[in-house]
Amino acid sequence: MRIPCLLRPLLGWFFGLCILFSALFGNYIITLFLGLPILGRHKQWRNLMDRAISYWMTIPMGLLEFLMGVRIRVSGDEIEFGSPAMIVMNHRTRLDWMYMWCALYQINPWLITSNKISLKAQLKKLPGAGFGMAAAQFVFLERNAEVDKRSFDDAIDYFKNIDKKYQILLFPEGTDKSEWTTLKSREFAKKNGLRHLDYVLYPRTTGFLHLLNKMREQEYVEYIYDITIAYPYNIVQSEIDLVLKGASPREVHFHIRKIPISQVPLNEQDASRWLTDRWTIKEQLLHDFYSEEQPINRQFPVERGDGVWRSWKEPRRHFYVKLTSLMFWTLVISFCSYHIFFVRTLQLGFLYFFVISFYLSWRYGGIDKYIIFKWQESRKSLQKSPSSSSI
């Protein structure tokens, strides 16, 4: 359904406000359960957060598809739920990770409960959503090699110890593809005697290699999923365009290749070259994709045995889950927005959330860092006790 241009900014503002208010209410609920990690109940905390926050994720997914008219097409290999893995993907826009939720939902709705994303640390400061993503234990990167390595190490140790099998999304390019980053990538290619890439940026291998080595060390990786994202009609670069202008891509396509970890070289230099080679393949794939003049005909090639998932042909139960979730959160937003002015209990509840949120940010660097801190404390106390087990 094509939406008139005059209505687009209104839809964008509505989208942004729904995300903000639903996230604030959800964050208040999250803080009510902080007693679990305090008491050392880390598995129960993680199970609760994974399910609760993935239920909230159906709001942006539903709004993108039902309100903004975004269509999702996924082709290639299926991502296995219940197997720890790394996902590497090109970073075309600042919003790729949000469309990724829609893609995972099409393959298997449970995948949105087991997907963890590495993101720029600035996104933790997003009003409402930032706190929720931190509670989901996404990995926030500071662009400081030593700090980021420690963040990866803590995350993998934590996930392994509580026996949760996640698929961790990494953007090896380190940033989205803009005019400025394309220029920097071109300078890098020229300096290192490499050919210029038109559709992707050259991947930065330091973070990839460290995460790969850590996951291998902990026996926490079975596959690497190489995902290519493309926009056949129009590209919307940032959240500013989405919220303030109401701009959204008409379709987003994903192509997945599943690679057993045994096929990835053990030597760091060879693994670095392997990743660069994957990006060269990705460049050719995107070149062929965009070489098709008619956007309606732009699709990734499907080989024998590949799956194809389309949001406009999804199973009816998947559709109704998103629809009922969207209706539920719309009622929650309406109820809270009205009663926050009159109900003292609700006012005190939100005051409690803001105080807790500020304290966790000031004292620990965020709820994600607090959870890691409490988990490490629990491990130390168990190691001192006569009998210890995983938490």
Curated annotation (Swiss-Prot):
| Location(s) in or outside the cell | Endoplasmic reticulum membrane
Q: Which GO terms describe its cellular component?
A: endomembrane system; endoplasmic reticulum; endoplasmic reticulum membrane
Q: What happens when the gene is disrupted?
A: Mutants showed defects in vulval morphology and in the asymmetric division of stem cell-like epithelial cells.
The entry's note on the tissues where this protein occurs is: Expressed in seam cells, vulval epithelial cells and the major epithelial syncytium hyp7, and in several head neurons including AIY interneurons.
UniProt GO molecular function:
acyltransferase activity
UniProt EC number? 2.3.1.-
User: How does this protein sit in the membrane?
Assistant: Multi-pass membrane protein
Q: What is this protein called?
A: Lysophosphatidylinositol acyltransferase 10
